[in-house]
């Protein structure tokens, strides 16, 4: 089954300051950091354009046979086991935050870092809001949903981004483009698959027990133990717990700002 591509616009979801701190590399909030986050949130206010485009497809489109690895990923195959349909989606918060990051990467690295963290939290919150809408909508239709699964998770290759863009027409639908090096612009964007399976196969409680968290971003299930953004229950050795000066050292060590020409306009 090929799908009509649907576009949805969202108001910015509620802000999770704890996630912003995590993406900044902070284990605790100091008055200095709190003031920085407040200032950056004020500057970013009204600049986000939260959009999602998606389509519902037969999972057979990706799994040609029992032995086939959909989009070249055995991990994705496991995630889609038992799923007769799959939702492919792309989400973005727009280009304006990229422009702020680019501007402050030269003027104030601390603000650039904070805007990076805000952008990461904003796009994840947008995806979570879309995930929840899909869960509710398809529960009423007799389906349960798997956690979302994105290119770059496990063995799911980034080259699969091309298939998302071909099927969803992302540039026209939500202004999202893909570079030759497989980077998305705007940079604070996500593509992912949500598997749908009949509610008769197992209870929702069992599904949640077998799967990562409902939004598909549970650090406990990820094999990348040295990830700089690993959640606090499994803290990485590299994340600082101090103030701005320590965070900036972490920023210089771990962060590379990759911006397209559009972000500098």
Regions found by a protein language model. Name each.
Residues 1-112, 241:
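Active-site helix-to-loop segments that bind/position phosphate- or nucleotide-bearing substrates
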Residues 35, 39, 121, 125, ...:
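Conserved active-site and cofactor/substrate-binding residues in soluble primary-metabolism enzymes
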Residues 41-48, 131-134, 138, 223-226:
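Structural signal for hydrophobic packing residues in well-ordered secondary-structure cores
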Residues 83-151:
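Conserved mixed alpha/beta catalytic, RNA-binding, or beta-rich assembly cores of soluble enzyme
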Residues 141-232, 241-251:
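Short terminal or interdomain "cap/linker" segment that borders an active site or interface and mediates
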Residues 252-253, 265:
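Low-acidity, Ser/Thr- and Arg-rich intrinsically disordered low-complexity segments
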Residues 254-258:
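Short, positively charged and aromatic/hydrophobic N-terminal segments
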Residues 260-264:
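Short, intrinsically disordered C-terminal tails of secreted or membrane-associated proteins
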């Amino acid at each position: 089954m090929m799908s009509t591509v649907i576009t949805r616009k969202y108001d910015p979801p509620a802000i999770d300051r704890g996630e912003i701190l995590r993406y900044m590399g902070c284990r605790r909030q100091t008055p200095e950091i709190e003031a920085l986050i407040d200032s950056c949130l004020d500057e970013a206010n009204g600049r986000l354009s939260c959009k999602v485009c998606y389509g519902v497809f037969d999972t057979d489109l990706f799994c040609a046979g029992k032995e086939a690895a959909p989009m070249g990923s055995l991990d994705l195959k496991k995630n889609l086991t038992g799923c007769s349909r799959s939702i492919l989606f792309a989400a973005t918060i727009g280009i304006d935050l990229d422009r702020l990051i680019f501007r402050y990467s030269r003027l104030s690295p601390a603000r650039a870092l904070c805007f990076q963290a805000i952008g990461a939290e904003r796009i994840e919150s947008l995806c979570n809001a879309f995930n929840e809408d899909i869960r509710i909508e398809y529960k009423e239709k007799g389906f349960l949903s798997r956690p979302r699964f994105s290119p770059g998770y496990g063995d799911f290759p980034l080259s699969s981004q091309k298939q998302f863009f071909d099927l969803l027409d992302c540039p026209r639908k939500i202004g999202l483009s893909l570079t030759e090096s497989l980077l998305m612009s705007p940079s604070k964007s996500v593509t992912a698959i949500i598997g749908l399976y009949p509610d008769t196969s197992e209870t929702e409680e069992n599904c949640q027990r077998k799967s990562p968290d409902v939004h598909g971003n549970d650090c406990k299930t990820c094999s990348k133990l040295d990830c700089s953004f690993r959640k606090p229950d499994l803290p990485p050795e590299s994340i600082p717990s101090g103030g701005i000066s320590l965070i900036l050292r972490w920023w210089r060590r771990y962060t590379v700002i990759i911006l397209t020409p559009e972000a500098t306009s």
